[in-house]
């Protein structure tokens, strides 16, 4: 059956709200290569939206899941617990850059992790308010939609959203927003909208994902830490997209001296299996009463087995170092292209969490059309890319960190061609 035939079946069988970017259908995948049902091959720089830092079907991950399949597939951890969950929590507790002694709880999706981080913060403080940032993306459930700082397409037609959520600007040199602008906005909130002692949490992404790979300045993170300490607010770092070696360190917060109280994780945690988590200061994590956290599939044993494999792969294959090496090669390609492509307004990121932003060279305004044109040129040559950003004018790069050098070089050649056409 052809891609088009599957496409017609999809239109008939599934709702339009589940938007689909590609008009081809996956047949198989290995490492950084994806093959469709017609036999066409693509270099996958989308990686299931940052889920495959260790690549498609890494042999060690497949073996770990197969071994777990022979033991049991589900018990519901809060009914019958299992050792692998506890061991994974111990590993995350030792690795995560959070304040004080740590504890970890596992869930299923990134949105679930963020929802539970807010629950934990509210239980700990007894306060309702949450401050988030414009351009941030935290999920598609109601609380996480409220936290998300972008309306289209995530919020259209779904209001009203949960209250006591407030947004402030996220720093962006390109768009003229300084760290001080962000901090001044928080202080204005305290004066005009909610008193500081009613704020449970400030949540931010150290590198905004859907927002365009904007990197939080160290001064911003330090100031958030000071504000949280001063007012008894819980500091939450959302690492759903940035975690597990993507930025050249295991977590993006490892780039900063200041530590959050809670940190959310998902996506590449289990290499394609549905697993998320919240790790944080033990005293804060213990605020909810027994039964307040959990979920039927939370910490599923197959996904937990995959996560153990992911951590081993990252260590064994030195993927943090690999992320820095590949990211520098990508940056060099983009910076060189910038000299002859006036539409390139900025190249930014950490490690292999790199993005390029496009403006109309005539008007200087953000141009989603240019980003989409380059995305389609690359796709026509077999390179799968994703756009993002508040204006849809950013291309982000999320290749598996396990991609072979020759394939990465081939992707860079396609990217150069797409930028120069």
Named regions from a protein language model:
Residues 1-421:
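Conserved N-terminal phosphate-binding loop of PLP-dependent enzymes in the Aspartate aminotransferase
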């Amino acid at each position: 059956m052809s891609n088009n035939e599957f496409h017609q079946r999809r239109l008939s069988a599934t709702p339009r709200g589940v938007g689909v970017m590609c008009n081809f259908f996956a047949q198989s995948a290995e490492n950084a290569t994806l093959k469709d049902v017609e036999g066409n091959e693509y270099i996958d720089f989308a990686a299931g939206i940052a889920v495959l830092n260790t690549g498609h079907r890494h042999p060690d991950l497949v073996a770990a899941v197969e071994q777990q399949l022979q033991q049991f597939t589900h018990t519901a951890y809060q009914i019958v617990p299992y050792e692998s969950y506890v061991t994974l929590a111990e590993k995350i507790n030792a690795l995560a850059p959070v304040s004080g002694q740590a504890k970890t709880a596992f869930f299923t999706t990134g949105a679930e992790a963020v929802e539970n981080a807010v629950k934990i913060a509210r239980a700990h403080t007894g306060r309702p308010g949450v401050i988030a940032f414009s351009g941030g993306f935290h999920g598609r459930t109601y609380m996480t939609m409220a936290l998300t700082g972008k309306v289209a397409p995530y919020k259209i037609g779904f209001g009203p959203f949960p209250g006591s959520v407030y947004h402030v600007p996220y720093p962006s040199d390109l768009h003229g927003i300084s760290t001080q602008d962000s901090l001044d906005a928080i202080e204005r909130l305290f004066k005009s909208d909610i008193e500081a002692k009613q704020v449970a949490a400030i949540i931010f992404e150290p590198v905004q994902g859907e927002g365009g790979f904007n990197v939080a300045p160290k001064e911003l993170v330090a100031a958030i830490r000071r504000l949280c300490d001063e007012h008894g607010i819980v500091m939450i770092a959302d690492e759903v997209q940035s975690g597990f070696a993507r930025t050249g360190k295991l977590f993006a917060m490892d780039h900063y001296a200041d530590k959050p109280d809670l940190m959310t994780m998902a996506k590449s945690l289990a290499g394609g299996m549905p697993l998320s988590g919240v790790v944080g200061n033990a005293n804060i994590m213990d605020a909810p009463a027994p039964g307040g956290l959990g979920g039927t599939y939370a910490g599923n044993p197959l996904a937990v087995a995959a996560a153990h494999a992911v951590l081993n792969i990252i260590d064994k294959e030195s993927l943090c170092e690999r992320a820095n090496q590949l990211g520098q090669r990508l940056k060099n390609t983009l910076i060189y292209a910038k000299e002859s492509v006036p539409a390139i307004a900025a190249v930014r990121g950490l490690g292999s969490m790199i993005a390029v932003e496009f403006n109309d060279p005539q008007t200087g305004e953000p141009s989603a059309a240019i980003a989409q044109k380059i995305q389609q040129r690359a796709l026509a040559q077999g390179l799968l890319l994703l756009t993002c950003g508040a204006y849809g004018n950013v291309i982000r790069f999320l290749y598996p960190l396990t991609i072979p050098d020759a394939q990465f070089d081939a992707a860079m050649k396609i990217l150069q061609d797409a930028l120069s056409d």
